[in-house]
Structure formats: C-alpha cells, structure tokens
C-alpha cells in the first residue's frame, strides 16, 4: 500500500436494504472532505474543541462565575434531615451547579440539562458519579418540558413549598454509596472525590456527605465543556440511532487523552436518555481495554448491557449499574504482555456477541494505543466488530497511521453488505498547566483504586472501608471439591518449584475461573498445576486476594468480594485459579492506619537489609581492556 491517505465516500452504492443509511450519511462529514486514515505521530495538545479544563480555563469565566451556584442557607439551600444526608438546592434560570462525589439526584421542579441532555422533574432518582480525577459536567437548570409544571415533593417536605416556589429549578441531592470513604485507604487519592480544602457549609462536616458543592472556580477541578463540533455529531448520530430499523455499531479510534472514553460516554447517554419517556431498549457495550476499562473488572475485558432506566451518569469507575453478560481475564493492563492471549480473548468475546444477532446499538471501547501492536488491535477489532460508524479523534488534525486499514464494506447477518460511515473529530485540548492535585490522578493510580473498590465491594453496593487484613478471609480447599488447578500466566508451569508456589501466591490478586471438568494437572506439592490451560473450557467469574495458604491442611484463605462470594457459595463447581500480573494495592498489604505496632507483625513485607559487602561475588573472566594482554 502506498503512503497516500485512504479516502472513503459516503455516496458509493451499497446494498438495497441500506437505503436509510444512505439518507443519513448525507448529514455526515465524509472522508472525501477530511482524510481519516492518516499518519498520526505526535502529542500536540494545542487543539481547542471539547475542553477538559481546569478551573482557570472555565469558558467565559466572568459570565460563568455569575451563573455558578453558591449555597445560602435557608434561601437556596435547605437540609432535610438532622444527619444532613439530604439537601434541597434551588437554582435560578440557566444557573450551573458543580458537584464532586457520588450522589443521587431528584428533580423536584422544572428540569435540568446534563451533557446537553434534558431531564424533566419527577420522582425518579438519578445516580451520579463525579470523581475529581475526571472533568465534571455542570448540572444546568432548565424548564419542565411538558404541558404543566408540577412539584414532585414528598409529603414530609411539603412545608418547603412556599420557600421554593419562586425558583425555576429545584433539586434534591442525597448521599450515594460510601465509596468516597474508600479513598482514605489510599492517601495519594484522598481528594479523589473533591478538594479537601473546600467545606460545604458551616455546621456540616465533610464526612457527613458523599458529595461536595463547588461554589468557586478552582484549579483542583476540571470542567467539561462540549464543543459545537462534538454536539453536532452526537445529535446526528442520535437521529440515526432513533430511526434505524437495523443494528448500529459504533467504534471510536484515538490515542491517549484523546477524549475517546468521554465521547463514547456522551453518546451512550444521548442515545438512552434523549426522550423523557425512557425506553426499554438497552445498549451493548463491548469493553476490550484492560488498562482503562469503562465497565470491566480490573485487567479484564467484558460484554455488558446498559439499561436506560438504571444507567449511572458520569464516570462511575466501573462501579455503576449495568449487567455483565460475558467477561475474560487478561491478567495485565497492557495487551502487549500476552498478545496471543489478548487477541484470542477479544475474538472469543466478539464471536459470542455476534451470535446474539442484536438489532440495537452496540459500542466497542478499544485501548488508546495507535502505534505498533495497537494498530494490530485496531485492525483486528475492525474485522470482527464490523462497525457501522467509525470516529477518528486526532489532535489538531494530525494524521493516523496508514497501517490502520478500514475495509470498504462489511457484511453481517443483520445488514447484509454495508459501507461504514467514517468521521473525523478533533480531540479536546489538554491544559498546559495542570495543578499538582490533578497530576496525581494518573492511570496507574486509578487502576489501584478500581482494584481496591472491586475487592471491598459489598452485596448492597456499599464498600468495606477497613483494610482487608483486618477482615476474616473465606476458606477454600485445594483438591477435587475446591480449586482443581493453578495457572501462572507469567511463568512456564513446568519450570515452577513447589516450594516457591506458596510464596508467589501469598498476598496476590488472582482470578477465579469456573471449570466444566477436572483439568489435566501435574501436582507440585499440594498444588495441582495445569498442564495445558488453553485446552480446558473455563469461565472467568471474578477476582480475589489471597490471604494465606495452609500447606498441611491443603486450604487457601482468600478475600472474596461479598457480592461474588454469594454466587460462589450457591453453586458447587470446580475452580481454576489464575495468577497474572495484577498488582495488589499497597494499602491491602501495609495499611496506613498504624495497625502494625512493630516490624515483626507486618505480613507479606520483608524488612531485611543486606549488610555491607554482603552480596554474591561474580568473577569476571577474559575481560580485555587497553593495555591488557593474555599470557
């Protein structure tokens, strides 16, 4: 292939069954106008389309500061309980409300717009997730889109009616789950759910609430500003989604910090919540990015179903409300560690999804890797996902690699033969001066938080706040009725020495797989090590943290999330334990609350230091230097 940029036109003849697609394509910018398969090889962040700004870059700062909500007790802010876990917020016309944290929101009067989607007042509670590690979308007051505006206020709060009647929009904000307290285990992420130096109101302690109102622009919080270009494309794609009688498959391609996940989140929200009367149609979300997943467990890929009535708004850090249909454990945040394992898992997941013959809308979230092996991942995903819509996100119009090959047409059971619609959008500009507080929220730290949240999750969607070393582990046997096989992805099982297996497992995160039958194993001590893991049919169920192993009793003690442990207890299966490269959060091995009073008490951690000159001496032979001669 030459280095010329591949171009595609939207008016090429296609299958007769795709008449509606040809009509809608006229609304899109085609690649005959803008090249889409290009030679991207840079990190220029000077674009200015959709901005994830810090507070100092808030658009129209003077105007917005006047519109930014600031609470005043007994005027536009009312507490509903002695515990202050519920508050009423009154907004004037077009006023912006910025909230960090995890909370539930009910629109008592009027309406709101959130990410350019309108929501009417009603008794429904919406679940919001606004961590400070991501740009926060403002909640903007709006009107009631209906014949007659109503006041959706419970009986016990009717005495507030006269105090709130003069406001255009009235909201009830209540506490969410206690995930905001979980950051206390990770000191470097202690302000992940909002700046610590901001107090809500006099008399209300920060620990009383799972959310925090931002009443003053700060460089500790980024604000999401959606560009006109993005809004136009999102609206046009929503029309296609609403009017299509066939399936729709969306794939977004972009590098790191390109806004790929943000755009897909906005599209999902627009598709599911555009109408005030929520439909029962769900969206399928295929998440094959093990490093920064949207829905998958840590270092895994998954196929999920997102329902419009229960969908979580904002960045839920894989803790929102959704249904997982299928998942595969990768064992690493990078597909490059075991490329064959990753490719096989992706292909298996997409094939299982294809058999569903889903006629709705599906999204594919791929890694933000557009060079080297990342190009192979993109091409592999294109071949198997067969998208109807492909969006390229580039910085300042910089081209992508010419090795990304988009087929001229795809063929599926649902659509026969069709030509993909290809769009190119600009990525958001990244602030050149990011505050020290925001610099801590890198991908590795967020992965550690997700692993911690996963392991601490309870059945009722709350979280265990104390370190796991202070909890009682669950007991599982090693043998025919428990764990029937061990697999180590990093090492060859045949090269393992049985005395080293216990040490290599203590205090590590492992994956539990359900096996259909007893695998072919080789016993090394008490450990049944798999001979050929790829030949046995297993199903990934979830992650666990190993507390300890009793070699004499052939028992293994593990911390298993409460919601997962109930499922394991209800079924009698054979289990295979897989160890990858997943790192255990340091807060699980050595909590910062001072529970270990002396060095002797600390498990998993060796404080031994070699004495001076205590090391292995290696004699160097035949080292030839200038002036040296062999005799």
From Swiss-Prot:
Pfam families named in the record: CLP1_P
Similarity section: Belongs to the Clp1 family. NOL9/GRC3 subfamily.
Gene3D superfamilies: P-loop containing nucleotide triphosphate hydrolases (3.40.50.300)
Coiled coil regions, renumbered to chain: none
InterPro entries given in the database record: Clp1/Grc3, CLP1_P, P-loop_NTPase
Protein's name in the database: Polynucleotide 5'-hydroxyl-kinase GRC3
Region of interest (Disordered), ranges: 1-65
Keyword NADP: no
GO cellular component labels: nucleolus
Binding site for ATP: 254-261
Protein's organism: Kluyveromyces lactis (strain ATCC 8585 / CBS 2359 / DSM 70799 / NBRC 1267 / NRRL Y-1140 / WM37) (Yeast)
UniProtKB keywords: ATP-binding, Kinase, Nucleotide-binding, Nucleus, rRNA processing, Transferase
Subcellular location(s) per record: Nucleus, Nucleolus
GO molecular function: ATP binding; polynucleotide 5'-hydroxyl-kinase activity
């Amino acid at each position: 292939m030459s280095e010329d940029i591949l171009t595609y036109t939207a008016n090429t003849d296609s299958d007769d069954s795709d008449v509606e697609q040809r009509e809608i394509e006229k609304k899109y910018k085609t690649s005959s106008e803008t090249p889409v398969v290009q030679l991207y090889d840079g990190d220029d962040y000077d674009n200015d389309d959709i901005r994830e700004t810090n507070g100092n870059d808030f658009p129209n700062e003077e105007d917005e500061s006047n519109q930014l909500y600031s609470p005043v007790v007994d005027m536009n802010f009312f507490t509903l309980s002695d515990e202050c876990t519920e508050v009423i917020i009154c907004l004037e016309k077009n006023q912006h409300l910025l909230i960090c944290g995890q909370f539930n929101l009910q629109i008592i009067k009027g309406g709101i717009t959130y990410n350019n989607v309108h929501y009417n007042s009603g008794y429904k509670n919406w679940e919001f997730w606004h961590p400070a590690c991501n740009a926060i979308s403002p909640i903007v007051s709006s009107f009631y889109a209906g014949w007659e505006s109503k006041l959706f206020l419970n009986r016990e709060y009717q005495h507030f009616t006269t105090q709130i009647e003069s406001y255009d929009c009235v909201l009830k904000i209540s506490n969410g789950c206690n995930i905001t307290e979980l950051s206390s285990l990770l000191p470097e992420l202690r302000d992940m759910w909002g700046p610590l130096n901001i107090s809500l109101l006099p008399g209300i302690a920060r620990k009383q609430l799972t959310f925090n109102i931002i009443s003053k622009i700060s460089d500790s919080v980024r604000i999401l500003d959606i560009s006109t270009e993005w809004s136009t494309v999102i609206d046009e794609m929503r029309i296609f989604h609403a009017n299509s009688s066939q399936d729709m498959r969306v794939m977004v391609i972009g590098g790191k910090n390109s806004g790929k996940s943000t755009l897909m989140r906005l599209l999902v929200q627009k598709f599911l919540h555009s109408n005030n009367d929520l439909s029962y149609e769900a969206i399928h979300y295929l998440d094959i990015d093990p490093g920064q997943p949207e829905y998958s467990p840590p270092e895994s890929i998954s196929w999920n179903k997102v329902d419009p009535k229960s969908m979580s708004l904002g960045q839920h850090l894989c803790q929102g409300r959704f249904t997982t249909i299928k998942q595969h454990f990768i064992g690493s945040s990078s597909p490059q560690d075991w490329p064959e394992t990753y490719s096989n898992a992706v292909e298996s997941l997409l094939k299982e999804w294809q058999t569903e013959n889903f006629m709705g809308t599906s999204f594919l979230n791929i890694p933000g890797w557009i060079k080297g092996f990342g190009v192979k991942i993109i091409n592999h995903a294109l071949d198997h996902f067969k998208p109807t819509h492909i969006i390229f996100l580039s910085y300042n119009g910089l081209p992508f690699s010419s090795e990304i090959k988009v087929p001229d047409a795809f063929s599926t059971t649902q659509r026969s033969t069709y030509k993909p619609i290809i769009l190119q959008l600009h990525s958001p500009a990244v602030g050149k001066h990011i505050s020290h507080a925001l610099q801590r929220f890198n991908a590795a730290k967020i992965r550690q938080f997700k692993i911690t949240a996963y392991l601490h999750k309870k059945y009722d969607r709350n979280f265990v706040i104390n370190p796991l070393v202070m909890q009682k582990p669950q007991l599982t046997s090693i043998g025919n009725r428990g764990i029937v096989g061990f697999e180590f992805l990093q090492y060859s099982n045949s090269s393992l020495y049985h005395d080293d297996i216990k040490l290599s497992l203590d205090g590590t995160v492992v994956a539990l797989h359900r096996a259909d039958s007893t695998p072919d194993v080789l016993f090394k001590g008490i450990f049944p090590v798999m001979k050929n893991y790829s030949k046995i049919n297993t199903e990934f169920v979830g992650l666990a943290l190993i507390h300890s192993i009793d070699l004499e009793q052939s028992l293994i003690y593990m911390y298993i999330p409460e919601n997962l442990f109930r499922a394991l207890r209800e079924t009698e299966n054979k289990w295979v334990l897989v160890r990858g490269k997943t790192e255990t959060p340091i807060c699980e091995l050595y909590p910062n609350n001072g529970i270990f009073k002396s060095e002797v008490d600390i498990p998993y951690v060796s404080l031994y230091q070699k004495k001076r000159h205590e090391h292995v001496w290696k004699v160097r032979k035949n080292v030839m230097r200038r002036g040296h001669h062999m005799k």
